[in-house]
């Protein structure tokens, strides 16, 4: 069974805030308040996702995070404790590969959002650069988000959690998930022993490998963080021409096949 890593949250938000868990994304630690100025929190239709600010006006997330009444929060660390840098935006435009529904668990799970107003850089808001080179198998990668910190029950943290995982050969994921095609625009990442993973509510957030923004949280095993069940991440590098074309105003640009 696989899990799209988005999470219905509003009905459980109050309970989650009240809980104090020593469980560590899953298997990680509380992110340092200064290490994620590019990380955004996306709410829509009673669900939550993550996302990545790539310049003052654009956010990159997963296509399956699309929905109505979307709100995007930037400069956030604690959900409960506001800071002077926190900003709220809504989408001005959304862009997808072909259409908002033309994606699969292994292809085109990517959405580019133009904010209704640009944000200014500050101590807690700053974009993350797009990758300058392709990802390399064996890289140590950082995941982060406000998703559930328990693989078996929904427990949302007040602050984002961070963990290090490894970029694995795509064939590792093909062996686990037989529905995957021979090739795709998807990265395979995780810890084969289990215990560390992105999970529900982390969808759309970044996979940062050797300091470069290489992936977007997409889907994985259910429950999360199980041995030999790594996660799948949309390959950002493979979509660079599409991303840059859209930002430059070329709406005719197409995603890679």
UniProtKB/Swiss-Prot annotation:
Transmembrane segments: none annotated. Snake venom serine protease that may act in the hemostasis system of the prey. Monomer. Expressed by the venom gland. Residues 25-248 form the Peptidase S1 domain. InterPro entries: Peptidase_S1_PA, Peptidase_S1_PA_chymotrypsin, Peptidase_S1A, Trypsin_dom, TRYPSIN_HIS, TRYPSIN_SER. The active site is at residues 64, 109, 203. It is found in: Secreted. Glycans are attached at residue 102. It comes from the Eukaryota. CDD domains: Tryp_SPc. Keywords: Disulfide bond, Glycoprotein, Hemostasis impairing toxin, Hydrolase, Protease, Secreted, Serine protease, Signal, Toxin, Zymogen. Residues 1-18 form the signal peptide. Belongs to the peptidase S1 family. Snake venom subfamily. This is Snake venom serine protease serpentokallikrein-2. Its main location: secreted. GO terms for biological process: proteolysis. It is an enzyme of class 3 (hydrolase). Disulfide bonds join 31-162, 49-65, 97-255, 141-209, 173-188, 199-224. One of its GO terms (cellular component) is extracellular region. GO terms for molecular function: serine-type endopeptidase activity; toxin activity. Its EC number is 3.4.21.-. Residues 19-24 form a propeptide.
